[in-house]
């Protein structure tokens, strides 16, 4: 892209010199997008033109507890004000991890909230995953919960989790079935055999330093990647650990989100931008290339290859197939985008779901909808 190359520690770092981008998409689709996002200010949804011709009735809401620590002016029609994690299980149910309202399950007919009365004592959920037996695992700031469809079981210090504050995207079930848990004080692995015998079933993964883990993922080759807020990125191939940090030409030691594109490249978010790693070369994109905001933390790559990046103050849509500077489209508060995006998820049908500080949004590839308890859940 007309950049310049620097060599550090045997690794090539590419930095772009493209001038800042001020361009915004001026299509009808963008106008629709920005108008809908303005509904974060408390307006009703449905400023996208026509709503679905035959919307399905809203689901039955099942909630047997009073939400904790919610603002007096909290909009009770929202699925929840803060949605920190989103996941779709093997049965197609969508799960939403919230702050102060536990976890909610949507199965097309009901929206069910689970909290203290159900044995799910903690109300803030930062990570969700499913194991090979169909159990759901939830990461909270009070340890891990396993849900077998009937009963919640909590794991904490007594089970070997010396640190019980689970990271965002801090639960991974790898291809072999091993369950990894990232905390703010290291990474742990779960031993189901020890659990069945009533012993300590979580043990510290000692091949890693005691990192402040910001996320765990498995790539297409079966390597496990760990993002940290203080030591860069680590890759584990089943035998050895490789650390990619400042000394290896990563521009900083902070890494937040991780994703892998269709070509096998790894992408990392950092405080000052995002970085693509092809196994040899690190290519960095910053505000000079068109990224908006500061302190980049979330990243997801759609099945189509479109990359979404969340940051403090903005969200950026990045199309790698388009030459810079036109590859980036930034949405900020100036565009009416006042919602702080806290989670992004693409379901099996390809629809994109956005958890924000002002509720839930759905993006079907063409339009954005704010999804409240009564919908619209489907387009």
Task: Explain the meaning of each model-derived region.
Residues 1-379:
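Carboxylate-rich, polar loop motifs that coordinate divalent cations or form catalytic acidic clusters
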């Amino acid at each position: 892209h007309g950049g310049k190359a620097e060599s550090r520690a045997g690794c090539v770092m590419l930095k772009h010199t493209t001038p800042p981008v001020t361009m915004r998409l001026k299509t009808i689709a963008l106008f629709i997008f920005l108008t809908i996002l303005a509904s974060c200010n408390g307006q009703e949804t449905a400023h996208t033109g026509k709503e679905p011709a035959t919307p399905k009735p809203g689901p039955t809401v099942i909630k047997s507890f009073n939400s904790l620590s919610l603002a007096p002016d909290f909009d009770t029609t929202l699925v929840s004000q803060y949605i920190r994690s989103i996941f779709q299980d093997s049965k197609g149910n969508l799960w939403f991890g919230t702050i102060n309202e536990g976890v909610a399950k949507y199965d097309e007919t009901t929206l069910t909230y689970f909290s203290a009365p159900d044995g799910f004592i903690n109300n803030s959920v930062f990570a969700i995953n499913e194991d090979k037996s169909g159990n759901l695992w939830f990461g909270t700031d009070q340890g891990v919960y396993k849900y077998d469809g009937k009963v919640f079981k909590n794991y904490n210090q007594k089970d070997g989790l010396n640190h019980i504050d689970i990271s965002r995207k801090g639960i991974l079930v790898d291809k072999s079935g091993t369950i990894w848990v990232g905390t703010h004080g290291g990474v742990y692995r779960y031993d189901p055999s020890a659990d069945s015998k009533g012993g300590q079933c979580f043990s510290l993964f000692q091949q890693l330093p005691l990192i402040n883990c910001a996320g765990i993922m498995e790539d297409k080759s079966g390597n496990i990647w760990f993002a940290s807020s203080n030591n860069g990125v680590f890759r584990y191939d089943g035998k050895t650990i490789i650390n990619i940090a400042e000394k290896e030409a990563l521009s900083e030691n902070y890494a937040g989100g991780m994703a892998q594109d269709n070509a096998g490249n790894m992408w990392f978010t950092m405080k000052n931008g995002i970085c693509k790693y092809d196994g040899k070369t690190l290519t960095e994109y910053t505000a000079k290339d068109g990224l908006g905001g500061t302190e980049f933390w979330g990243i997801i790559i759609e099945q189509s290859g479109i990359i979404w990046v969340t940051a403090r103050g903005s969200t950026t849509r990045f199309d790698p197939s388009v030459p810079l500077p036109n590859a980036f489209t930034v949405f900020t508060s100036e565009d009416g985008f006042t919602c702080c995006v806290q989670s992004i998820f693409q379901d099996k049908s390809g629809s994109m779901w956005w958890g924000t500080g002002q509720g839930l949004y759905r993006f079907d590839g063409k339009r954005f909808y704010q999804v409240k308890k009564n919908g619209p859940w489907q387009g």
